[in-house]
């Protein structure tokens, strides 16, 4: 597994570039389908957002999700998968703190 986070040239927008080696071979459609499924239900609902719309760093500023999965950038080659997730490193973090406080109170 390998990854990098890059702060984009805007005040708060960033992107994560994550590369993983999986036990089984997958294709782009399988990866994107799984991320879409997880984003719409379960523990990551409201935290992970799935999109197939083209994004730029300024689209992320003010976004409350911890990660916006950019399906247009997904790559798969056998066991290797590369995915990208955009996030507003200030606002998304603040929203998760509010979530935590709501659980504690």
Predicted regions and their residues:
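C-terminal substrate-binding/catalytic lobe of Rossmann-fold NAD(P)-dependent oxidoreductases
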Residues: 1-81
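NAD(P)-dependent Rossmann-like dehydrogenase/reductase catalytic/cofactor-binding core
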Residues: 64-105
């Amino acid at each position: 597994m390998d990854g990098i986070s890059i702060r984009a040239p805007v005040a708060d927008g960033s992107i994560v570039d994550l590369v993983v080696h999986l036990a089984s071979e997958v294709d782009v459609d399988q990866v994107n389908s799984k991320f879409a499924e997880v984003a719409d239900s379960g523990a990551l609902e409201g935290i992970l957002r799935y999109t197939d719309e083209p994004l730029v760093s300024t689209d992320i500023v003010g976004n409350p999700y911890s990660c916006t999965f950019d399906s247009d950038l997904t790559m798969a080659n056998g066991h290797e998968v590369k995915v990208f997730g955009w996030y507003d490193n200030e606002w998304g973090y603040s929203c998760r703190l509010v979530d935590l406080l709501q659980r504690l109170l």
